[in-house]
Amino acid sequence: MDRLSFLTFIMLILASYRLTHLIVFDKITEFIRKPFMKKKRIVDQNGHVDEKSVPASNFGYMLNCYWCAGVWCAILIGLGYLFLPRIAIPLIFILAIAGAQAILETAVGVGVKLIDVLKSLQTMMNDKKS
């Protein structure tokens, strides 16, 4: 690898982001995380019982930690790009598109919520003036 173009670098970042999110958060990969998690009962001051999933091992912590999994996903994506480009590049391309889409979807969702909040504030201000 002599030079890495800016576009390729951005695609590697987006692919790593999406793979990390897929492993740590997405419902579709819950079956991967589940064997490494255990249920823990938590009782609050009022006596309410809640059940929470916590990592059962160091590997469980890695699968549950965005920062930890992110490092390993970046290593996997980077090594795949360098040593198995015929296999890795199509996967990187797909993951990069999905990663960019996820970021855009989040931005749109935040924007829609912000608009709703601003409309509510405007309505409250108009009601106070009346």
From Swiss-Prot:
The keyword Cytoplasm does not apply. Its main location: membrane. Keywords: Cell membrane, Membrane, Transmembrane, Transmembrane helix. Changing L91V: In strain: ATCC 6633. GO terms for cellular component: plasma membrane. InterPro entries: Mycophage_PG1_Gp7 (IPR010773). It comes from the Bacteria. Changing M125I: In strain: ATCC 6633. The chain crosses the membrane at residues 4-25, 62-84, 89-111. Pfam families: DUF1360. It is found in: Cell membrane. It is a multi-pass membrane protein. Belongs to the UPF0713 family. This is UPF0713 protein YngL. It comes from Bacillus subtilis (strain 168).
